[in-house]
Amino acid sequence: MSTRFEGSYLGNAARLADDAVLECKICWHRYDPAVGDEVWQILAGTPFAALPAHWRCPQCDGDREQFMVVDD
């Protein structure tokens, strides 16, 4: 079974691969675990599923549940 899926994350961390890149559906900001998040002081190598519960989009303050998996 693949750990990748199409569409919104909706809080289901079990469906995310550790290297999954996710994109905010409001402002299109991408969270790339290889880069992390400087605004929230998230270290590179941190999977989206391991982000703190209070984490929000650093660009538009959107809910993390609004992020979609990028399938490049």
From Swiss-Prot:
InterPro entries named in the record: Rubredoxin-like_dom (IPR024934), Rubredoxin_dom (IPR024935), Rubredoxin_ET (IPR050526), Rubredoxin_Fe_BS (IPR018527)
GO annotation, biological process: alkane catabolic process
Keyword set includes Lipid biosynthesis: no
Binding site for Fe cation: C24, C27, C57, C60
Organism domain of life: Bacteria
Job description of the protein: Could be an electron transport intermediate in hydrogen oxidation.
Name used for this protein in its record: Rubredoxin in uptake hydrogenase operon
Protein's organism: Azotobacter chroococcum mcd 1
Lineage, opening ranks: Bacteria, Pseudomonadati, Pseudomonadota, Gammaproteobacteria, Pseudomonadales
